[in-house]
Amino acid sequence: FSGATAVTQGNSSNVTVSSALSSKSLEIYGGAIALNENITTTGTNADVLIKAISNINLAASKTITTVAGDVNLWADSDDNSNGYVQLLAGAAINSTGGDINLGGGADLMSDYAFGTTTETCPEVVGTQYISGVHMRQGTSLNSNNGNISVRGQNANTSNAAMSFGLSLRGVTMNSGTGKI
């Protein structure tokens, strides 16, 4: 980790995962959280919780993997309508039977991750707001019979930019017998 000395509940410093993590289960709390390396849980039913006050980014071609554990990426946990979840090109979440939940706000299961930042996006012509949940080309969510929930919202304050609650292009979601 870098950027914070603690990653426990209540931490508000930005956190960067800069080396691969392998743990029985894992919880990371922070301001903005950058997942720049692979994360793997080693215990069966061991969950991953990434809870950010603002944004969560899973770097290109990086993976989060569990064995029947839930994966929860929870942005904008202070519920101030400013915090997105972004999976960059080729990133993957594999829960092998656990649920995958991407969202934000006060309650991960009923509120939304919220995009407010603009960027020039290579997948489209022009400028767009980063969506509440933004999954780039080649990303995948594979729950192998767990449920998948993706909840995002956006507030476009400019007529010169596009905005979407969810932005999914060239994305694979496979829940097996689970619900999406």
Label for each model-derived stretch:
Residues 1-3:
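Extended repeat-based solenoid scaffolds, especially LRR ectodomains
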